[in-house]
Regions:
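Small beta-barrel nucleic-acid-binding modules, primarily SNase/OB-fold domains
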Residues: 18-156
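Positively charged n-region of N-terminal signal peptides that target proteins for export
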Residues: 1-4
Length: 156
């Protein structure tokens, strides 16, 4: 009983510490699809976002143009982003698994941003990616999603 109370207390402290760090973080999706969090560049672990045609959002000023993956991330990220560092690159940037909740609540199921892009057909799984990422990519490819199909705006 005592050990389960201690475990629960530790779990709540970790969640509270995670939430506090995440809430204080400002997240900016850069044009290449990487995230800028507290001044550090974070790349989504396990995926590569191919350079594709740039699309522009003219609903905001100044007009922003970015890759399809970056535009999809900007659209999807409407709440706190939780990232867990996996590795560090030579340039000081991080590779991380980043999750979001749909309504910004701590105890809500989270969406993996890399898995989201793979599912939309806007990224490919790298060789060191988790098995789940490779499976999601295969499903998107078989269903012709994203760049596995065709883009309506590229028809001449």
């Amino acid at each position: 009983m005592r050990s389960s109370i201690a475990f629960l207390s530790l779990a709540l402290l970790l969640v509270a510490a995670d939430a506090q760090a995440a809430v204080g973080s400002r997240v900016l999706v850069q044009d290449d699809g990487s995230l800028k969090i507290n001044g550090r560049v974070v790349h989504l672990f396990g995926i590569y976002m191919p350079k594709d045609g740039r699309i522009c959002d003219n609903s905001i000023r100044p007009i922003r143009c970015a890759s399809r993956a970056a535009s999809a991330l900007r659209f999807r990220i409407r709440s706190v982003v939780y990232c867990e560092n996996v590795s560090k690159n030579r340039d000081g940037s991080l590779n991380a698994v980043c999750l979001i909740s749909s309504r910004g609540q701590i105890f809500e199921p989270k969406t993996d941003l890399a898995a989201y892009l793979l599912n939309e057909g806007l990224a490919v799984a790298l060789p060191n990616a988790p098995f789940e990422y490779k499976t999601i990519e295969r499903i998107a490819r078989s269903q012709g999603r994203g760049f596995w199909g065709f883009f309506a705006d590229s028809i001449n």
